[in-house]
């Protein structure tokens, strides 16, 4: 690829290839041969844009780039180090013939919209290169990278004046096979100078920042003295003071006079003590310590008691748990026993009920048998007591024996009746005679 010298890349842009010597141009006057005989393609021309070659040392690339992105009619050998530039091409169909790296001849039909490709007549037919010309073609001198870089260096202004930016961009897009020569890039002193300049500038900027920070940095040991100096009164008021037993007794008396440590205030205690060198801060701190010391044993007792209670409760809970577990197990055992007994009783009751039902059935069967036997007996007695008679005869009655007895007893009854009538007559006769006698006496 060809880039400007400002970017540190060795490059040269030329439209006439002045770098090559004249003897190569003389040996190959007809590097591109034009054929006007093929006019069948003139009806459907395919536009193909032609760009000048860019010489970049030993690198090479495609020459043509069409509007569609490809130009199938052009083949360029990458082994050749220099090629003549193509300015314009006529509308006729042309054939570009050249020799590749292996010495093979290639024909490339190209159609363009320019006026002239090279100063040759259109009647000239396709020409081939001779072996003598090909021999001299490969006799190029070995290029020196340093000499080539020093020889082909061009300033940025000249590059911009000779080549416009759109053409250069299109050329970069079309030159797919162009690759940068990294050895030349690394060996270029301009690139190294550029990087050294950038490094020096960055180091200068870093130094300036460090100096600025050092100027504005403040010593941490001096910060409290520079920020705010505490007043002398606070320093004197916060001086430590040793509480003597006398002061403590006066302090306790003042607190008792004020109604206890909860109601006492540091200012009131200070007024009651009236000791020199004693401040409100001393009284306040001592009062706080007194309150905490007073409530500590109570709190400790209160805390010990709940701990003991908690321990007792835990032990009680454990014992209760054991007792309850034992009781629960015993209750479960009793319940199991009761359930077993109930189950046994239910089985006994069921067996008794079954036995009672069987006995009832047996009694019923016995009663039925007795009834049947009685009926059979009655039938047999009735059949044996009844004589055989005519069907017209009345049925025998059970009252006949009684009638027979009555007939047998009839004479006795008649006799009794006769005797009764005789007795009646005798009584009547006697009564009549008695009545006659009474009448006579009257």
Curated annotation (Swiss-Prot):
**Region labeled Disordered — which residues?**
370-442
Q: Where is the composition biased (Polar residues)?
A: 395-434
Q: Name one Pfam family in it.
A: Myb_DNA-binding
Question: Where does it localize?
Answer: Nucleus
Gene3D superfamilies reported for this sequence: Homeodomain-like (1.10.10.60)
| Gene Ontology cellular component list | nucleus
Biased composition regions of type Basic and acidic residues, renumbered to the chain: 370-380
- Residue numbers of the DNA-binding region are 266-291
Coiled coil: region residues: 329-349
InterPro entries reported in the protein's UniProt record: Homeodomain-like_sf (IPR009057), Myb_CC_LHEQLE (IPR025756), Myb_dom (IPR017930), Myb_dom_plants (IPR006447), PHR1-like (IPR046955), SANT/Myb (IPR001005)
Motif LHEQLE, residue range(s) on this chain? 342-347
The keyword Zinc appears for this protein: no
User: Could you state a single Gene Ontology molecular function term?
Assistant: DNA-binding transcription factor activity
Record GO biological process:
regulation of DNA-templated transcription
Is the keyword Coiled coil in the record? yes
Q: What is this protein called?
A: Myb family transcription factor PHL13
Q: Which organism is it from?
A: Arabidopsis thaliana (Mouse-ear cress)
Q: What is the lineage of its organism?
A: Eukaryota, Viridiplantae, Streptophyta, Embryophyta, Tracheophyta
| Name of the gene | PHL13
């Amino acid at each position: 690829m060809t880039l400007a010298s400002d970017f540190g890349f060795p490059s040269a842009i030329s439209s006439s290839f002045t770098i090559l010597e004249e003897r190569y141009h003389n040996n190959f006057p007809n590097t591109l041969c034009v054929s006007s005989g093929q006019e069948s393609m003139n009806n459907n021309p395919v536009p193909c844009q032609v760009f000048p070659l860019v010489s970049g040392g030993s690198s090479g690339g495609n020459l043509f780039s069409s509007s569609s992105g490809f130009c199938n009619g052009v083949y360029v050998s990458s082994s050749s180090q220099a090629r003549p530039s193509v300015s314009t091409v006529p509308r006729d169909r042309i054939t570009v013939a050249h020799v590749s790296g292996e010495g093979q001849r290639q024909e490339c039909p190209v159609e363009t919209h320019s006026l002239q490709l090279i100063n040759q007549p259109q009647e000239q037919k396709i020409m081939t290169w001779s072996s003598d010309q090909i021999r001299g073609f490969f006799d190029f001198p070995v290029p020196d990278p340093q000499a080539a870089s020093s020889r082909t260096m061009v300033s940025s202004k000249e590059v911009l004046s000779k080549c416009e930016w759109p053409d250069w961009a299109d050329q970069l897009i079309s030159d797919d096979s162009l690759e940068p020569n990294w050895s030349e890039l690394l060996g270029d002193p301009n690139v190294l100078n550029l990087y050294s300049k950038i490094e020096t500038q960055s180091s200068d900027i870093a130094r300036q920042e460090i100096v600025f920070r050092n100027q504005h940095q403040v010593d941490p040991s001096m910060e409290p003295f520079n920020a705010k100096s505490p007043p002398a009164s606070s320093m004197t008021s916060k001086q430590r003071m040793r509480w003597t037993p006398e002061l403590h007794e006066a302090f306790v008396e003042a607190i008792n006079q004020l109604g206890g440590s909860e109601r006492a205030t540091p200012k009131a205690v200070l007024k009651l003590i009236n000791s020199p060198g004693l401040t409100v801060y001393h009284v306040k701190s001592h009062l706080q310590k007194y309150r905490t010391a007073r409530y500590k044993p109570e709190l400790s007792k209160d805390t010990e008691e709940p701990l003991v209670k908690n321990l007792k409760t835990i032990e009680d809970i454990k014992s209760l748990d054991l007792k309850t577990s034992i009781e629960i197990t015993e209750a479960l055992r009793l319940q199991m026993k009761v359930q077993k007994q109930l189950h046994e009783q239910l089985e006994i009751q069921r067996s008794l009920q079954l036995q009672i039902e069987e006995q009832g059935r047996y009694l019923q069967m016995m009663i039925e048998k007795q009834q049947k036997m009685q009926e059979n007996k009655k039938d047999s007695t009735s059949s044996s007591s009844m004589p055989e008679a005519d069907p017209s005869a009345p049925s025998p009655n059970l009252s006949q024996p009684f009638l027979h007895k009555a007939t047998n007893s009839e004479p006795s009854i008649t006799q009794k009746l006769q005797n009764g009538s005789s007795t009646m007559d005798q009584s009547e006769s006697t009564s009549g005679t008695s009545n006659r006698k009474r009448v006579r006496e009257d």
